[in-house]
Amino acid sequence: MSTNAIAKRYAKALVQLGSEAGSVDSFNAELTRFSALLTDSRDLSAVFANPAYGIESKREVMKELVAKLQLSPMISNLLMLLLERGRISVLPQISESYGAFADELSGVIRPTLSSGLPLEASQIEEIRSALAKSTGKKVELKVEVDPSLIGGVVTKIGGKVFDGSVRTQLARIQDILQKG
């Protein structure tokens, strides 16, 4: 089974447990925090990945981290389970999948809006409102400036891309002219 499929299984189960406990958001924050720690600290990742360190040593390190970060018992149990099964390296994917499932559960989408020039707050709000109206979900928009677009905007929602950039329009015109 692929690591992505494994990550999704753990994430889906944890979202269900979090939903029952009313802790979806706090679990998400804890997972994100621990995952970032694991990703940012090469030494920590090396300890958990190195078979020379016994499982007891790894458990002690994990217990100390859980205590310092004041993680909930549910997240603590998940981390110990991943450690026992040799899957702690999958935690970043679990965290990412958890975030996606949690957003789906709460009716949130997180599109990315790229524009050739910086947009004014009123323009961003207008786009956010239009996306919320068309999707029926709460929109948390990530705005980026990409000068290569020349002008216009590109919106990415999940796997879909809505490209209204000048760069793409020019490429289409060039393609039409070349084909004659």
From Swiss-Prot:
Compartments where found: Cell inner membrane
Membrane topology note: Peripheral membrane protein
Family annotation (PANTHER family): ATP SYNTHASE DELTA CHAIN (PTHR11910)
Stored InterPro entries: ATP_synth_OSCP/delta_N_sf, ATPase_OSCP/dsu
Family membership: Belongs to the ATPase delta chain family.
Organism, scientific name: Citrifermentans bemidjiense (strain ATCC BAA-1014 / DSM 16622 / JCM 12645 / Bem) (Geobacter bemidjiensis)
Keyword annotations of the record: ATP synthesis, Cell inner membrane, Cell membrane, CF(1), Hydrogen ion transport, Ion transport, Membrane, Transport
Gene Ontology cellular component annotations, sorted alphabetically: plasma membrane; proton-transporting ATP synthase complex
Name of the molecule in the record: ATP synthase subunit delta
GO MF terms held by the record: proton-transporting ATP synthase activity, rotational mechanism
